[in-house]
Amino acid sequence: MSVSNEYKLVVMGGGGVGKSALTIQFIQNHFIEEYDPTIEDSYRRQCQVDEDTCLLDILDTAGQDDYSAMRDQYMRTGQGFLCVYDVTSRTSFEEINVVREQIIRVKDNDKVPIVLVGNKCDLENLREVTEGEGSELAKSFSVPFLETSAKKRLNVDECFFEVVREIKKSLKEPGRSKKDKKGGILKKFKGGDCLIL
């Protein structure tokens, strides 16, 4: 089985939302019970996404509040992002706007491949964020949305595969426009770049 594509995925979100639990469940098929704050961990997994054999290079990052100096660097190198919040934490859900804005600022592109992930959906009795709220936020961002449970292994593979699909989709879009620093749109015309303000 030869690998045709390699993708760099970055898992982002607040501290304690289950980024490491999701990533380790995806890579090693087991659930980590104890919370040990991550600085930065990198994992690789070869897998089949639709018809393609892919090598996923996954960066499990520190929570939003920690280690912000490294954040811009891994946002620059990432191709696709899982923006994870905890359905039992309204605060982590509200932080997602900031996470997305940081990604868009660093990538200088508002069409970055992102999947919104509401983790810990097995803790229904502690839920603070409804599935409908997650779905509405994803719709406002124009990104896919999944609720997951790292503990029960619900939608774990699917959320990573969905990011790969979003990356593939973005790579197929010809001449995607990019916002410049002043808010204009750069478009390719014969003879060079033009700035439309």
From Swiss-Prot:
Main location: membrane
Activity control summary: Alternates between an inactive form bound to GDP and an active form bound to GTP. Activated by a guanine nucleotide-exchange factor (GEF) and inactivated by a GTPase-activating protein (GAP).
EC category name: hydrolase
GO molecular function, one term: G protein activity
Keyword line: Cell membrane, GTP-binding, Hydrolase, Lipoprotein, Membrane, Methylation, Nucleotide-binding, Prenylation
Keyword Membrane assigned: yes
GO cellular component: cell cortex; cytoplasmic side of plasma membrane; lipid droplet; macropinosome; nuclear matrix; phagocytic vesicle; plasma membrane
Keyword Mitochondrion: no
EC code(s) of this entry: 3.6.5.2
GO BP: cortical actin cytoskeleton organization; mitotic cytokinesis; negative regulation of cytokinesis; negative regulation of endocytosis; positive regulation of phagocytosis, engulfment; Ras protein signal transduction; regulation of cell cycle; regulation of cell population proliferation
Pfam families recorded: Ras
Propeptide stretch(es), residue numbers: 195-197
Lipidation (S-geranylgeranyl cysteine): 194
SUPFAM superfamilies listed in its UniProt record: P-loop containing nucleoside triphosphate hydrolases (SSF52540)
InterPro entries cross-referenced by the UniProt entry: P-loop_NTPase (IPR027417), Small_GTP-bd (IPR005225), Small_GTPase (IPR001806), Small_GTPase_Ras-type (IPR020849)
Motif (Effector region): 35-43
Catalytic activity: GTP + H2O = GDP + phosphate + H(+)
Membrane topology qualifier: Lipid-anchor
Transmembrane segments: none
Localization, UniProt: Cell membrane
Binding residues annotated for GTP, in chain numbering: 13-20, 60-64, 119-122
Cysteine methyl ester found at: 194
Function of the molecule: Ras proteins bind GDP/GTP and possess intrinsic GTPase activity.
NCBIfam families: small_GTP
Family stated for the protein in its record: Belongs to the small GTPase superfamily. Ras family.
Protein name: Ras-like protein rasB
Protein's gene: rasB
